Amino acid sequence: MDAARRGDTQPVMWTTRWLLLLPLLLCEGAQALECYSCVQKADDGCSPHKMKTVKCGPGVDVCTEAVGAVESIHGQFSVAVRGCGSGIPGKNDRGLDLHGLLAFIQLQQCTEDRCNAKLNLTLRGLNPAGNESAYEHNGAECYSCMGLSREKCQGAMPPVVNCYNASGRVYKGCFDGNVTLTAANVTVSLPVRGCVQDEACTRDGVTGPGFTLSGSCCQGPRCNSDLRNKTYFSPRIPPLVLLPPPTTPAPSTRTQNSSSTTSTTAPTTATTTIKPTTVQASHTSSTHETEHEVIQEEGSHLSGGATGHQDRSNMGKFPEKGGAQIPSKGGSDALGSWLSAILLTVVAGAML
């Protein structure tokens, strides 16, 4: 019986527990923060009929709204974000100036439901905005993108404006950049072009709470068509001059020169090497030939004429084999002297 009663009471206990937890869960769901949510890109994206109400996730206890307004001498626009945020409640306002482009940022965070609709997101007059017709044009021309989408602000598509000086400032430079606003985990970005004071700024920027305005400047008629990937320097800086690369002879010319050099010097080297070897090899034989040549030369001088040269050219050569041998002139003279001596002896004996 006790076991049966325990089995019957167990489902009742689980049901009772769920009934007790249900109000707590309902209270927790009811306590989720509700915030307005919208995005404005120089349009009416945050107008009352376009705003939505969202429930924030766990751990989110503030609603956020942020607005950034940008103004040049030719116009102004604003970007804004509303939604569930993070951080501490409060309000932050800041004004910025980038070479004559003015910006005003407001950030507001609150902890009540749908409390993030207090800021004025409409356009506001910022100095130096004024009546353009009241100023005289200074001759500079620039492309102007104030609140245009990126599709309408490409290259030479945006309108061209004439720059003028305002509030004691000289606007003769052209600007090309971007404005970026980040709030409630949403980032909004739009292009910015127009007349500015600086004529040679390079990727300059100003920042505020979740806000950035940055870009580059240039000088010249409509020079701000695209400065994102270009670098401009002040006219006071000397220009950079690129030197031409050094010229080198073609590979075929070097090959011909080297081959001609080798063919020219090779015989000289070979001749120089052979000469000492020949002299050393024939040194002993040439000594004997020189002595024999001196003797023959003396005989030739005594005999005289071309005969001496002829005998010297044939000296040191062995007689050819076969045939009659022709005696030299020196042998003929000796034979004549010997015959003369015999005849004289015979004549002398006969006389005695």
Curated annotation (Swiss-Prot):
Gene source species? Rattus norvegicus (Rat)
The record's Gene Ontology cellular component field reads: membrane; plasma membrane; side of membrane
Q: Disordered: where is this region?
A: 236-330
Identify the glycosylated residues: 120, 131, 178, 185
For the lipid attachment GPI-anchor amidated glycine, which residues are annotated? Answer: 330
Q: How does it assemble?
A: Interacts with AGR2 and AGR3. Binds laminin-1 and laminin-5. Interacts with LGALS3.
**This protein's encoding gene:** Lypd3
User: Please, which domain of life does this record's source organism belong to?
Assistant: Eukaryota
Does this UniProt record's set of keywords contain Secreted? no
Lineage from the top down?
Answer: Eukaryota, Metazoa, Chordata, Craniata, Vertebrata
Could you confirm whether the keyword Lipoprotein appears in this record?
Answer: yes
Name the major location: membrane
According to UniProt, the name of this protein is Ly6/PLAUR domain-containing protein 3
Question: A GO BP term, please?
Answer: cell-matrix adhesion
Q: Name one GO molecular function term.
A: laminin binding
Q: Where is the composition biased (Low complexity)?
A: 250-285
Q: What is the tissue localization of expression for this protein? A: Found predominantly on the basal layers of squamous epithelium. Expressed in the gravid uterus and on epithelial of the upper gastrointestinal tract. It has been found in tumor lines which metastasize via the lymphatic system.
